[in-house]
Amino acid sequence: TLDVAIGGSINDRITNSTRIDSKNASLKYANVFNLANIVMSSSASIDQKIDAHYQLQSVFATAQIGYKEGVFLDLTARNDWSSTLAYTKYEKKGFFYPSVGVSFLPDKWVKMPEWVSFSKLRGAYSIVGNGVPPFITYPVSYVTAGGEILASDAAPFGEMKPEMTHSVELGMEWKFLQHRLGLNLTYYRTDTYEQFFKLPALAGDKYAYRYVNAGDILS
């Protein structure tokens, strides 16, 4: 048997935010956080206004191949284009991440004792990509109250790479005595690479911070 699915998606998100400095730091009613509930003073002002537009475009495909109802091969592939990776080499090509999984049902191929009701062996390898927050690859300035321009304190990182998580999973499942007793064992390992960090810049740098890709988290 062969089952195939192909698709695409667009995640488009627009954020408009306004920060108001009331000069009083108090609310009319406790724990009600909206502009109308702020106690304003005569010197209150709009401290900062930030607008952000984020878009993630994706294409993906899945396929499952089955053989004699006893062996199954599952394949997936996905490519994402994230607006937060603009001004990097991933702006045009995006980032690709696949997965492959195999499951085998021994009882479909080998005659099992009557007390064995079900048996399954499985294994999978996958890669999952993740973009970065906005305003990392390109510096952004904000206009504050009084017309002051607040520049970004971190250098643009044009070499930014998407975070990637590699996973391996092996397992088995057995059912005995007409499914009254079961055994399910799983081994998995995940490695996350290319995390991004905001680190203090060297003395004399025109920026206070710089971004780097680093790290390897194993679980």
Segments predicted by a language model, with ranges:
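Extracellular/periplasmic, surface-exposed regions of secreted and cell-surface proteins
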Residues: T1-S219
